[in-house]
């Protein structure tokens, strides 16, 4: 296992750490029953009725599972 030869300064440590960035997920807009919702792409979407009761999961326009 690699071991640092010298202690890394606080400035260098913080400069290195500043490169760690979280990226915001890309969302897909979908409209269902007049409501706009955003979801992750390439994942099954939960379809609900007007009252909000979950009915089934849909992917690429096909029913893939019951809720």
Curated annotation (Swiss-Prot):
InterPro entries: Ribosomal_bL32 (IPR002677), Ribosomal_zn-bd (IPR011332)
Disulfide bond positions: none
UniProt KW Transport keyword: no
Cellular component terms per the entry's GO annotation: large ribosomal subunit
Any GO molecular function: structural constituent of ribosome
Coiled coil ranges: none
A GO biological-process term: translation
Keyword set, alphabetical order: Ribonucleoprotein, Ribosomal protein
Region ranges (Disordered): 1-21
Ranges annotated as biased composition (Basic residues): 1-19
Family recorded in the similarity comment: Belongs to the bacterial ribosomal protein bL32 family.
Protein name per UniProt: Large ribosomal subunit protein bL32
């Amino acid at each position: 296992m690699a071991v640092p030869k010298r202690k890394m300064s606080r400035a260098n440590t913080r400069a290195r750490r500043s490169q760690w960035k979280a990226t915001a997920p890309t969302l897909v807009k979908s409209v269902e029953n007049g409501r706009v919702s955003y979801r992750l792409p390439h994942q099954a979407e939960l379809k609900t009725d007007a009252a909000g009761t979950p009915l089934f999961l849909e992917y690429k326009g096909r029913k893939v599972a019951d809720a």
